[in-house]
Amino acid sequence: MAEKEEKEPSKLKSSTGVSRPTISLPPRPFGEMFFSGGVGFSPGPMTLVSNLFSDPDEFKSFSQLLAGAMASPAAAAVAAAAVVATAHHQTPVSSVGDGGGSGGDVDPRFKQSRPTGLMITQPPGMFTVPPGLSPATLLDSPSFFGLFSPLQGTFGMTHQQALAQVTAQAVQGNNVHMQQSQQSEYPSSTQQQQQQQQQASLTEIPSFSSAPRSQIRASVQETSQGQRETSEISVFEHRSQPQNADKPADDGYNWRKYGQKQVKGSDFPRSYYKCTHPACPVKKKVERSLDGQVTEIIYKGQHNHELPQKRGNNNGSCKSSDIANQFQTSNSSLNKSKRDQETSQVTTTEQMSEASDSEEVGNAETSVGERHEDEPDPKRRNTEVRVSEPVASSHRTVTEPRIIVQTTSEVDLLDDGYRWRKYGQKVVKGNPYPRSYYKCTTPDCGVRKHVERAATDPKAVVTTYEGKHNHDVPAARTSSHQLRPNNQHNTSTVNFNHQQPVARLRLKEEQIT
């Protein structure tokens, strides 16, 4: 029995030795792995490269699996041990299933019982082409063309060696790409580190002081906030300057703006103001420069009331009184010669520089005409010199009269009892006869007149008087000039210190053409 038992294992061993299957693939040329059309099929370069890097088959052959496992040295040993284990495991399965049939048949369940060592999960492509490795560089590599070198023959390099070389090149390309990406990111990280170090150094600078950091930060915040508020205030003042430019300098009186006029060549209009005190006829005109600054203030008339006091602002009233005192001091020399005669009448010698003032049109009770805009320049310059008249006065104010006298005479200059000096002449548009300008020769008398002949009637002489005389009619020099009666209240006498003449003199409004 012992011999039989010894023979049976020997027979079993012999039978297993005969029926053991051999997993070996038929010899396959090396070039067939790059294309699936057979040996006679010659694909293009792109097809060759695509077949090299990807394989559509889900289950690889043993040679391809072994070649993929060779990419890592550790997997090679595991793959070798797995092949031996598969060979021993496959023998009883085939003998039981086939009853000791031919060893060429392999159980179809072989792929299901494949050891885990050979179950290599791979992406759709066998290799991932790195950014640094292109198909052109792969084709130009000497190792790729060495596969088909005539010196080595068709099988100069094995399948495993070729795949190992391509894998090494791919890994090297991946390493180069990773190094480049790290170098490109390195400067940004260093800059961030430098900024963090600078911030840390700035926060650590005040550590030597005795004050805590919270106080230092609070002081820094207050300083920055103060600078910001200062810049905002400067911007606000810069923006609000054009808005406040419409308000002239405060002279102590209350004014109400009643009109303005656009000046040619300037963005800022000419403003007209009137004193807000009841029954006060004082008005003023404010001229501005191109940048909005007040360049000239022209006053007309005198205040018949005292300087008003500011409500709840003592400083403002003091400033107003100081300004009024300055006006009085600067014009004290002009007031000395007039104070003796102001008890009976008060005259004003202020003249407007242009005739477009709207305040003169509204004074119908004392003015029957309009100011000529075409007066000569000497008169205008003299008028501007007289701008600074005293504004702080409690006397009664009398506005300037403007009277037009039209007579028929062969002589242009009529004898009205006063002495005149001619200071200019001008040709009026639409009138062939010139206009002559005269000024009273009495000192400190600002009365003027201009004489012209009517364009429609050459014998009609039009004489326009401006202002009132602040003196009596001077005595006649010779008897030849006694053309006027001695009675000053005669209706033929034009005397502006008393009642206005109403006899032969016809008053009319002057029409400027």
UniProtKB/Swiss-Prot annotation:
Q: Where is the composition biased (Basic and acidic residues)?
A: 1-11, 229-240, 368-387
The record's InterPro entries line, in alphabetical order, gives:
WRKY_dom, WRKY_dom_sf, WRKY_plant
Organism of provenance = Arabidopsis thaliana (Mouse-ear cress)
User: Which PROSITE patterns does the entry mention?
Assistant: WRKY (PS50811)
Which molecular-function annotations from GO does this UniProt entry contain? DNA-binding transcription factor activity; transcription cis-regulatory region binding
Recorded hits in SMART domains, A to Z, give: WRKY
Cellular component aspect of the GO annotation:
nucleus
User: What Pfam families does the database record attribute to this sequence?
Assistant: WRKY
Question: What's the domain of life for this entry?
Answer: Eukaryota
Compositionally biased, Low complexity: which spans? 179-201
Using the UniProt annotation, give all residue ranges assigned to the region (Disordered): 1-26, 175-281, 297-394
The record places the DNA-binding region at: 244-308, 409-474
**According to the UniProt entry, which residue ranges have a biased composition of type Polar residues?**
202-228, 311-335, 343-355
Q: Where in the cell is it found?
A: Nucleus
Question: Which keywords belong to this entry?
Answer: DNA-binding, Nucleus, Repeat, Transcription, Transcription regulation
Role this protein plays: Transcription factor. Interacts specifically with the W box (5'-(T)TGAC[CT]-3'), a frequently occurring elicitor-responsive cis-acting element.
**Induction profile:** By salicylic acid and during leaf senescence.
Q: Which positions form S-S bridges?
A: none
The answer on whether this UniProt entry bears the keyword Transcription regulation reads yes
The protein's name in its UniProt record: Probable WRKY transcription factor 3
Q: Which SUPFAM superfamilies match?
A: WRKY DNA-binding domain (SSF118290)
Tissue expression per record: In young, mature and senescent leaves.
